[in-house]
């Protein structure tokens, strides 16, 4: 008989990063930056997204120094819905309406968690207006250059760049 999979202990020290499609280049660099900072501040970090974005991250972090745990988004949502996964902090990247929908799903499934929605891309203000649920929003027009968005993220979390 196979032992059931082990999941991190629920609690405020667990962070979940929800990734969108890897179409916009800044996302990958910022995910690695955020994960690095969170791990330095004592968080266990889990990333979730579609296979394409996870494969890009696996290539970028082959030794799993920044992202030791990753899973397919639909699997992660199922684990959360079944109360097998929890987090105190959920960070969602959104550059399309699908990202906003995933953030709304996380808000519904994780009502007690801090939800930070990072909205970026070519037209982030329009997307930000569609996020009509409780969350902290970080909004920046960013496609290729992550520096301004990184500065805003660092400000929200109190990290020194």
Model regions: which residues?
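Nucleotide-activated donor-dependent transferases that construct or modify glycoconjugates
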Residues: 13-22
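Structural motif
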Residues: 14, 88-92
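Short acidic, S/G/P-rich loop/turn micro-motifs used as interaction or catalytic elements
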Residues: 22-26, 53, 95-101, 123
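Histidine-anchored nucleotide/phosphate-binding helix
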Residues: 28-40
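A short acidic, amphipathic alpha-helical/loop segment
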Residues: 30-33, 101-108
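Short internal beta-strands
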Residues: 44-50, 117-120
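N-terminal beta-loop-helix "entrance" segment that forms/cooperates
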Residues: 51-72
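Glycine-rich, aromatic-bearing surface loops/beta-hairpins
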Residues: 106-161
